[in-house]
Regions:
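ABC ATPase NBD Q-loop/coupling interface
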Residues: 1-15
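Hydrophobic anchor residue at the start of the ABC signature
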Residues: 88-89, 116
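Catalytic Walker B motif of ABC-type/P-loop ATPase nucleotide-binding domains
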Residues: 99-103
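Conserved ABC ATPase "signature" region
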Residues: 52-70, 95
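ABC ATPase nucleotide-binding domains
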Residues: 167, 173-200
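Conserved ABC ATPase signature
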Residues: 74-78, 82
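Conserved switch/coupling elements of ABC/ABC-like ATPase nucleotide-binding domains
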Residues: 7, 28, 149, 153-164
Length: 200
């Protein structure tokens, strides 16, 4: 695996952490403050302590995610959406070129799902980042992602743009009968109801 032309397997853990940031599916339920959690994103760069540059990067990450007013609050007192934004800020503080996100919307309500993915997309466009997201909600994926990799039984089934989604893909990968429709210029997946066995 190469990032910016460099073989990640040839790099130390510290150097990998400077290039790749990970946002987990479940946010830790801890009494750590928002500021301290975001500061953890600077660990790959720290030697003898926290520098002025570290403070600046953390401040900018929290400002970007609108977290400045909650810098002193504990994570276990925040909503699921707020926690996920904190983890995005921590990832941003790493100054990576690649963001890895594992089901970042799985435990969020619809409003926070859209907010988190919108922020992630904006981050990629404004900070020139690449994001790889594991996500099972196809409609969210079609709305916010540019390229798609479909897996079937551990093997690559298809890779490409939104055009890779069709009735065959829905059947082969997800085991459902459905189709892709356009609504106000947006691709949506419609799943047909399974036919119930007739009772004789």
């Amino acid at each position: 695996c190469r990032v910016d032309g460099e073989d990640l397997l040839a790099l130390s853990h510290r150097e990998i952490a400077k290039r790749v940031a990970f946002v987990a599916q479940h946010v830790p339920d801890t009494q750590m403050t928002v500021h301290d959690m975001v500061m953890l994103g600077r660990r790959p760069y720290m030697t003898w302590g926290v520098t002025e540059h570290d403070h600046h990067v953390v401040h900018e990450a929290m400002r970007y995610l609108n977290l400045e007013d909650m810098r002193g609050r504990f994570l276990n007192r925040l909503s699921g959406g707020e926690r996920q934004k904190v983890m995005l800020a921590r990832a941003l503080a790493q100054e990576p070129t690649l963001l890895l996100l594992d089901e970042p919307t799985s435990s969020l309500d619809i409003r926070n799902q859209y907010q988190v993915l919108q922020i992630t997309r904006d981050l990629c466009r404004e900070q020139d980042l690449t994001a790889m997201i594991v996500i099972h909600d196809l409609n969210l994926a079609l709305r916010f992602c540019d390229r798609f990799l479909l897996l079937r039984e551990g093997e690559v089934y298809r890779y490409g743009g939104a055009e890779i989604f069709d009735a065959d893909a829905l059947r082969d990968v997800y085991g459902v009968k459905g189709s892709i429709v356009q609504v106000q210029g947006q691709s949506l997946v419609l799943i047909e109801d399974e036919e119930k066995e007739k009772i004789s």
